[in-house]
Amino acid sequence: MKYLWFILLICSPLSFAASFDCAKAKTPDEKVICSNLKLNDLDVEMSVKYHFLRGLFAMGVSGEMYDSQTAWLKQRQKCKGDTTCLLQSYRARINQLDKLYNLIEKPI
């Protein structure tokens, strides 16, 4: 599984910048993500995994994933500019997405 995620990150055009336009960053969390390489990398990793997984599921589950992502983004905003809080938030979300991926039945 790690290899699949790695390939997705390498091949993704998002792998060089945050998943949003840093020139338009307004909230404290967005500004810190854009200025911190580790947070920027985690943002890209989370975004790639989220969009990959969302594309695998039918509308019902895809809608639930969208709702879950929206709720997570609201929670992330509560971190404001706290780097430690943002790191924990991203790691927790990536862990959730990894667990969801592991639930998918895969061919050999």
Region spans (language model):
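N-terminal alpha-helical modules
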Residues: 16-108
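Sec/Tat signal peptide C-region and signal peptidase I cleavage site
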Residues: 5-8, 13-17
